[in-house]
Amino acid sequence: MGVEEELLLIDRSTGVPVPVADGVLAGARATRVPDPGGVVGEMQREMIEVTTRPHTSLAALGGQVLDNRALVEQVANGFGAHAAPLATSPTPVTPHVSDGARYHRMMQRYGSIPRQGLTCGLHVHVAIDSPAEGVAVLDRIRTWTPVLIALSANSPFHAGVDTGHASFRSIAWSQWPSAGPMERFGSEERYRAVTEGMLRTGALLDEGMLYLDARLSHAHPTVEVRVADVPLDPGVTVTIAGLVRAMVDTAAEEWRSGSLERDTPACTVRLANWRAALEGLDGELVDPLTGRAAPAREVVTLLLAHVLPALVANGDDQLVERGLADLFARGTGASRQRAAYATTGDLGQVALAAAMTSVHARTGRVAAGLWPGADTGSVIGGHPASSGLSGAVG
């Protein structure tokens, strides 16, 4: 498994996004040791993406997530910026398009969507044995992926206002032509037929614009799950990565055993996405088993029970359980951003506070020896999690 995190580049004094990605990208590549992962540019010069290499150990993945954030933060400081884990900018910004013909075509073709859509997500890749297995996985995880939106929710503010959503990034992202959930495919052949048909419409520039909630990667032998905000805390990134791997493993085992997938309509999954984006973990989510609204803690507990055998098999159960307990105890990035705004009344300060979470997490790692290690729990930045999941979630 591996992850891609998109980070917002903000001014160190004001918290306003700044177009310094070209310099940060060059500096990060020059600083990089061999075989680290990757640092790449995005469509707007106010953001950058960091990727891990593939890992089998969740703890090792977490260590590289921290290392990636620390690297781009260090380089960004040289340009008067922070690399902030923010899924949208709390302050108003007019993005600057990066160099490249494809990006300029997107800016020209899709109107206000890319111009107002400075959004940062988390993408999780999990290896599969074959495309056929991958499609079977897509068909079986689609009703569970809305829970990941709620867990990662980290974008309550946009363009200087509280949007009323926990994940406004999800709402903004849904404007892209192909974004969102799909109906069941049923076979690799059907997946190919559907996606090729989407490309034939001419609404998308290329295969890279198949912005499905989850898809077969066109570059790697993986399933790529794309619904999450970039989390405020690196520990949440690790927790979500562990859950996604377990979701994929569980779905693959169901397929191999002949278990049928649920025939939940895509419109229902889309509404589940919307509910998750609205309230995060502070309200209700859609129960994938009944299609009815239920308290968020109950739905997260259902997901945990669904994938627990895979978590145990991967050795991830304790780390993920503690990560979820910590998330419920401390709140999502959205709730913590709102708490910071209630204290400061300044959205620029909210952005700057978010930028420091990666710095503090790195300091906690050095002080406590948290990553990598066998007993990492979900202590990130020196904040211990609850001792178990039952008190916080169950």
Predicted segments — roles?
Residues 34, 38-41, 45, 97, ...:
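N-proximal short alpha-helices
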Residues 53-120:
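Well-ordered mid-protein domain cores that form the structural environment of catalytic cofactors
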Residues 61-65, 130, 137:
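Residue-level preference for long, well-ordered alpha-helices that form the structural scaffold
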Residues 86, 90-92, 101, 105-122, ...:
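Metal-dependent DNA replication initiation modules
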Residues 55, 82, 96, 104, ...:
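Histidine (H) residue identity feature
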